[in-house]
C-alpha cells in the first residue's frame, strides 16, 4: 500500500513539472576553412551500424549458451541472466563470463572491413546504466545487487578501447544509453523485464540518470574523444499521448549534457510519434542540438504482417515521412527482415525483394533522416545474421556504400549557371530583389560541402541544425531582410546539387 502511494505521488510530482528550455549558449560553428574533425563527426550524414548485444545482452544475437542459459533455461534479460548465474557461481566467475564475452565480441570486429570496404561512418553502441564506470553509480537502482560483477568485468574499460579503435579508423561512436532504470519500455533489452516501463514515472530514477550517470559518461568518455558523435539518452521510449515524464527528463538531460559539453548532440526517442517530438523540440528551442531517433521495422506489427513485401516497400515513402523541416532525425535501427506471414503472401525471388526493400529504405532515409542511419546489427555469435546482419546486406549490394575520396571538384560554371537562372527567373517580377543573398547562400553551402568531403568523404548531415546556424551567422553579419528567402534558397540549392555522391 505504501509503495503504491509512493509511486502515485512520484508520478504526480513529475507530471506537474514542465521541461525547461536550453540554458546554455551553444558554440558557434567554425567557418568552412576552419572546420575540424570533431565538428564534422557530430554533423555528418551517417552510414552506421549497431553493436547489438555487446554490452546490453541479447541472447538471440550473442552469449546465449555462455551467459544467458542456466540449467537449460534461457533468460532474455541481462539482470535475470546475471542474477541466476550468481546463484551457481561466484562474482569473480560471472565477471569472467562477461569479460570473456566482451573480448570475444570485440576481437571479431574487422576494423579494416568496416572502414575500407563497408566505409561505415559511425557505430551506435548500446549500453546500460549499470555499465557506466563499471557499476559505480548503482546505489538505489535495480542493478545494485550486481555491482561487484561489473566492477570486475570492466565494461567501461572495454568501451574506451572500442572508441579508440574506432578513432584510428575515422569512425564515430554514438553512445546509446539503451538501458535505463525501470525501463523506458517493457522489453528485455532495457536490461530487466518487469512488464512495465517505469522510468518516466519515477523521479528518483530520472534524477539519478541526469544528475549522476550522464555527467559520468561525459566526464570519463565523451570529453576526451573527438569521435564521439553524440549521446543517446533513451532508447525506444513508449508511445505516450501526454508524455510529461519524458519531456521533464529530456529537458533535464539536454541541459545537463550541454552544460558539461556544449555542442554535443543529444539524441531522444520519437516515442513512435515523430511529429510530437518535432513540435516539442521546436517549442523548447532544442532543434539545433537534438536529434530525434526513429526505428524502422516492418516485421513486428500485425498490420505489417498482414501485407505482402511489395506493399510494404511501396508504402515506405509514406510510412517513413519524418517532419524533417522542423527537426533533425536519424534512423537508429532498421534491418532487412520481414515476417514469415509477409513472405507467405509474397511471390518472386526473395533475395531480389530483400534487396529492393533495403535499398528503398536507405533511399527514403536519405531524404528525411538528416543524420543518416544505423543498421541493426553488426554481427552474430553464430552465422552472419542474414537479413539482420550488416555483412551479408553489404556484400549483396543491398546497403549503399559510400565512395572513397576526399577531393570534391565543383564546377564553377555550374554555380554561375544556377545563380543566373535564379536572377533571370525573378527579375522583372516587380521588386528590387537582393540576388546577392542567393549567391552568398549557394557559395557558402559549396564551401561547407567541400570542407566535409575533405574528411573521409563526408556529407553534411543534421541539415536543420546546420542551416539554422549558418543562417543566423549570415543575418548577424549582413543584417536581416525581407529577401532572406533568397539566401535560404541559395543554401538549399547548394545542398541539393552538391551534397551527394
Swiss-Prot record:
<keyword id="KW-0496">Mitochondrion</keyword>
<dbReference type="GO" id="GO:0046557">
    <property type="term" value="F:glucan endo-1,6-beta-glucosidase activity"/>
</dbReference>
<feature type="active site" description="Proton donor">
    <location>
        <position position="236"/>
    </location>
</feature>
<dbReference type="GO" id="GO:0005737">
    <property type="term" value="C:cytoplasm"/>
</dbReference>
<keyword id="KW-0378">Hydrolase</keyword>
<dbReference type="GO" id="GO:0005829">
    <property type="term" value="C:cytosol"/>
</dbReference>
<dbReference type="GO" id="GO:0009251">
    <property type="term" value="P:glucan catabolic process"/>
</dbReference>
<dbReference type="InterPro" id="IPR017853">
    <property type="entry name" value="Glycoside_hydrolase_SF"/>
</dbReference>
<dbReference type="InterPro" id="IPR050386">
    <property type="entry name" value="Glycosyl_hydrolase_5"/>
</dbReference>
<feature type="active site" description="Nucleophile">
    <location>
        <position position="333"/>
    </location>
</feature>
<dbReference type="GO" id="GO:0005758">
    <property type="term" value="C:mitochondrial intermembrane space"/>
</dbReference>
<comment type="similarity">
    <text>Belongs to the glycosyl hydrolase 5 (cellulase A) family.</text>
</comment>
<dbReference type="GO" id="GO:0004338">
    <property type="term" value="F:glucan exo-1,3-beta-glucosidase activity"/>
</dbReference>
<keyword id="KW-0326">Glycosidase</keyword>
<protein>
    <recommendedName>
        <fullName>Uncharacterized glycosyl hydrolase YBR056W</fullName>
        <ecNumber>3.2.1.-</ecNumber>
    </recommendedName>
</protein>
Amino acid at each position: 500500500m505504501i509503495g503504491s502511494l509512493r509511486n502515485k505521488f512520484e508520478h504526480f510530482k513529475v507530471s506537474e513539472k514542465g521541461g525547461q528550455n536550453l540554458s546554455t549558449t551553444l558554440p558557434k560553428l567554425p567557418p568552412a576553412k576552419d572546420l575540424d574533425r570533431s565538428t564534422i563527426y557530430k554533423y555528418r550524414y551517417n552510414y552506421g551500424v549497431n553493436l547489438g548485444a555487446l554490452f546490453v545482452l541479447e541472447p538471440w544475437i550473442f552469449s546465449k549458451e555462455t551467459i544467458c542459459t542456466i540449467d537449460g533455461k534461457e533468460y532474455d534479460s541481462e539482470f535475470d541472466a546475471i542474477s541466476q548465474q550468481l546463484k551457481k557461481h561466484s562474482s569473480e566467475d560471472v565477471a569472467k563470463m562477461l569479460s570473456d564475452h566482451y573480448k570475444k565480441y570485440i576481437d571479431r570486429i574487422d576494423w579494416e572491413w568496416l572502414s575500407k570496404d563497408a566505409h561505415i561512418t559511425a557505430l551506435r553502441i548500446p549500453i546500460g546504466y549499470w555499465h557506466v564506470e563499471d557499476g559505480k553509480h548503482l546505489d538505489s537502482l535495480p542493478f545494485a545487487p550486481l555491482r561487484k560483477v561489473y566492477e570486475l568485468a570492466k565494461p567501461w574499460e572495454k568501451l574506451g578501447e572500442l572508441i579508440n579503435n574506432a578513432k584510428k579508423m575515422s569512425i564515430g561512436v554514438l553512445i546509446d544509453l539503451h538501458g535505463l532504470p525501470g525501463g523506458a519500455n517493457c522489453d528485455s533489452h532495457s536490461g530487466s523485464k518487469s512488464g512495465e516501463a517505469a522510468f518516466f514515472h519515477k523521479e528518483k530514477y530520472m534524477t539519478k540518470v541526469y544528475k549522476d550517470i550522464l555527467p559520468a559518461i561525459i566526464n570519463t568518455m565523451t570529453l576526451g574523444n573527438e569521435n564521439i558523435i553524440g549521446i543517446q539518452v533513451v532508447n525506444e521510449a513508449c508511445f505516450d499521448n501526454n508524455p510529461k515524464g519524458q519531456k521533464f527528463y529530456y529537458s533535464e538531460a539536454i541541459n545537463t549534457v550541454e552544460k558539461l559539453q556544449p555542442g554535443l548532440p543529444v539524441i531522444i526517442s520519437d516515442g513512435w510519434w515523430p511529429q510530437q517530438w518535432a513540435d516539442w523540440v521546436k517549442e523548447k528551442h532544442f532543434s539545433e542540438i537534438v536529434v530525434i531517433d526513429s526505428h524502422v521495422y516492418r516485421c513486428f506489427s500485425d498490420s505489417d504482417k498482414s501485407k505482402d513485401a511489395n506493399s510494404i516497400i511501396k508504402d515506405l515513402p509514406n510510412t517513413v515521412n519524418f517532419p524533417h523541416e522542423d527537426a533533425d532525425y536519424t534512423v537508429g535501427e532498421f534491418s532487412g527482415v520481414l515476417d514469415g506471414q509477409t513472405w507467405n503472401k509474397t511471390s518472386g525471388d526473395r533475395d531480389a525483394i530483400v534487396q529492393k526493400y533495403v535499398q528503398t529504405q536507405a533511399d527514403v532515409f536519405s531524404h528525411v533522416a538528416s543524420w543518416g542511419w544505423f543498421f541493426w546489427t553488426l554481427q552474430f555469435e553464430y552465422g552472419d545474421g542474414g537479413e539482420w546482419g550488416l555483412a551479408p546486406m553489404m556484400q549483396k549490394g543491398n546497403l549503399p556504400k559510400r565512395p572513397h575520396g576526399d577531393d570534391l571538384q565543383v564546377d564553377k560554371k555550374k554555380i554561375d549557371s544556377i545563380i543566373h537562372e535564379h536572377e533571370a527567373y525573378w527579375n522583372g517580377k516587380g521588386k528590387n530583389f537582393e540576388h546577392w543573398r542567393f549567391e552568398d547562400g549557394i557559395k557558402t553551402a559549396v564551401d561547407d560541402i567541400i570542407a566535409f568531403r575533405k574528411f573521409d568523404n563526408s556529407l553534411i548531415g543534421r541539415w536543420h541544425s546546420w542551416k539554422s546556424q549558418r543562417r543566423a551567422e549570415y543575418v548577424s553579419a549582413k543584417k536581416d531582410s525581407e529577401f532572406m528567402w533568397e539566401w535560404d534558397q541559395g543554401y538549399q540549392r547548394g545542398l541539393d546539387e552538391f551534397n551527394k555522391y
